[in-house]
Curated annotation (Swiss-Prot):
GO terms for cellular component: eukaryotic 43S preinitiation complex; eukaryotic 48S preinitiation complex; eukaryotic translation initiation factor 3 complex. Keywords: Cytoplasm, Initiation factor, Protein biosynthesis. Pfam families: Paf67. This is Eukaryotic translation initiation factor 3 subunit L. One of its GO terms (biological process) is formation of cytoplasmic translation initiation complex. Its main location: cytoplasm. Coiled coil: none annotated. It is found in: Cytoplasm. The keyword Phosphoprotein does not apply. One of its GO terms (molecular function) is translation initiation factor activity. Component of the eukaryotic translation initiation factor 3 (eIF-3) complex, which is involved in protein synthesis of a specialized repertoire of mRNAs and, together with other initiation factors, stimulates binding of mRNA and methionyl-tRNAi to the 40S ribosome. The eIF-3 complex specifically targets and initiates translation of a subset of mRNAs involved in cell proliferation.
Length: 540
């Protein structure tokens, strides 16, 4: 097979294409030519120009190539395959260290997003070490690294870092499809790869080195943030990485089920107000999703409803900003759909008025049918809505090497679902109680007990008192009013009615705020006038 003439000819052909001379300069030139000839011309041209733009810090060109050219080439040449490997790219960009780290970040991100079957174990590990190289480069430096990248790339870099941690945690928890050798690699040889401590350490280090918390506090007090930014935080590169790392920490703690800490890490950010840092739509939407979900799990339904309503209105009004980027559009649409599901849950558990345009979407998408079933105590609808809309939870502790060969991916999800459904069961009967109370201004306890159960006795009246106390308790929530901390607030009753019991008589007061129909009609009139102007300008 490999004998004589055939082998010699093959060997000669190989050395004709890629010869080593012993001279490092000549060998580098041979290597450059060898890989350049294998690469499509437009890919080679793009990589050379991309490297040059990053070297020169030309933000406009970097952003254009990152947001437009890279996805276009990916669609055309690498739709279901990987981009060229580091060795091939290094040969045509003079092995530029910084560029190769950034290129590999895009390379592994592309593999996670596009390659059927997802990345292999060695690719997941190499991606982790590439992130380590990048963060060590910018955090361990004695002086600030003079690197400029567009804010959208910095956000997506941090977001992808957290996503790959989440993806690896789920991959590691699925032992049923792995050999003993793979389990040994994961649990023993590479036990620190994508560990929760590494992720938290990186994100907190970026927050600390940028002094972003001090800068945000200075802004809230009307002080120039540059006075507290420090040498690193003065640069937009470090400042934005620090801000996005706060959002990354919010996401990580939410994935772990630590909702108090998730909100606490955002304390310098006034999450219910717009800021100069919230100009990346995907970042703002992701922040609101995790904040709203954390509020819901903490039983702060009024804050969750406000958070979801505000961001869903924002999505309605700014859709054109991200609709040109299909992958981002898909991600935002999915997150918006999840938030509508969570909003529907919150409105069932804590009824209140919301913006008419959000109500209209809920009607158009038939959420009201599901909401009616939830109000009637259908626990399966609650469960299906929660499973669709919640984050993909992970466990901070991976399975040990000698654990039974089972699928542990669903364990964190099932635990959070159990906690949520326990709360729902406690509130299951409250809509029925509310519906009777809304019909009266005074109502004897015995009469209400007979409405709920026609065969009610004295014991049932005692149980009714417990139910009414539960109603009072569940409808009284901690609600944020002001201040930089999303954990602060005052206790308020969120129900449309309030009541007290005097002897055996329930006294009921309707506290419902009437709809402001004027605003709705003004918006519709303005929309109609705008449409009328456009029609008049059309030449037929």
């Amino acid at each position: 097979m490999y004998g004589g003439e055939d082998f010699n000819n093959t060997q000669q052909d190989f050395y004709d294409d890629y010869a080593h001379t012993g001279d490092p300069a000549l060998d580098l030139e041979y290597e450059r030519n060898y890989y350049a000839n294998r690469m499509p011309e437009n890919v080679k041209y793009f990589l050379i120009n991309f490297c040059q733009a990053i070297k020169e810090g030309n933000l406009y060109d970097i952003q254009n190539m990152y947001e437009n050219t890279f996805p276009q080439i990916s669609d055309h040449h690498f739709d279901k395959s990987a981009w060229p490997e580091e060795q091939e790219v290094g040969a045509i960009v003079d092995n530029d260290k910084v560029f190769l780290i950034l290129y590999k970040e895009l390379y592994y991100r592309h593999i996670h997003a596009r390659i059927p079957g997802g990345p292999k174990l060695d690719q997941r590990i190499n991606s982790f070490f590439n992130y380590c190289d990048f963060f060590n480069l910018i955090i361990s430096a004695q002086n600030p690294v003079l690197l400029e990248l567009p804010d959208i790339w910095l956000w997506e870099l941090v977001d992808e870092f957290v996503y790959q941690f989440q993806n690896f945690a789920q991959y590691r928890a699925r032992l049923t499809d792995k050999s003993q050798d793979e389990i040994q690699q994961l649990c023993v040889n590479h036990s620190n790869v994508w560990s929760i401590l590494c992720i938290l350490n990186v994100l907190h280090s970026l927050v600390d080195i940028s002094n972003i918390k001090k800068q945000l506090e200075a802004i809230s007090q009307g002080i120039d943030p540059q006075t507290v930014a420090g040498d690193f935080g003065k640069l937009a590169f470090y400042k934005m990485l620090g801000y996005f790392s706060l959002v990354g920490l919010l996401r990580v703690h939410s994935l772990l089920g630590d909702y108090y800490q998730a909100i606490k890490v955002l304390e310098p950010i006034e999450i219910h107000k717009k800021s100069a840092y919230s100009h990346i739509p995907a970042c703002q939407i992701s922040t609101s999703y995790y904040v709203g979900f954390a509020y819901m799990m903490m039983r702060r339904y009024a804050d969750a409803i406000r958070t979801f309503s505000d961001i869903l209105l924002y999505i309605q009004r700014t859709k054109q900003l991200y609709s040109t980027r299909s992958y981002q559009n898909d991600q935002i649409n999915k997150q918006a759909e999840q938030m509508y599901h969570l909003l529907a849950i919150c409105l069932v558990l804590h009824p209140q008025c919301i913006d008419e345009s959000i109500q209209q979407v809920l009607r158009e998408k038939n959420y009201h049918d599901a909401m009616f079933k939830m109000q009637c105590g259908d626990l399966e609808v609650f469960k299906s809505f929660f499973v669709f809309a919640c984050p993909r939870f992970v466990s901070p502790c991976p399975p040990v090497a000698d654990a039974p060969l089972e699928d542990y991916v669903k364990d964190p999800m099932e635990h959070q679902l159990l906690v949520f459904m326990d709360e729902v069961r406690q509130q299951k009967d409250l809509p029925t109680t509310r519906s009777y109370l809304k019909l009266y201004t005074t109502l004897p306890l015995t009469k209400l007990a007979s409405f709920i159960d026609p065969n009610a006795n004295e014991d049932d009246v005692s149980k009714l008192l417990i139910r009414l106390l539960c109603f009072k308790h569940k409808m009284r929530n901690l609600v944020w009013s002001k201040g930089p901390s999303g954990l602060e607030g005052t206790f308020k009753s969120g129900s449309e009615l309030d009541f007290y019991i005097d002897d055996d008589m329930i006294h009921i007061a309707d506290t419902k705020v009437s709809h402001r129909y004027g605003d709705f009609f003004v918006r519709k009139i303005m929309k109609f006038n705008d449409l009328n102007r456009k029609l008049k300008n059309i030449n037929i």
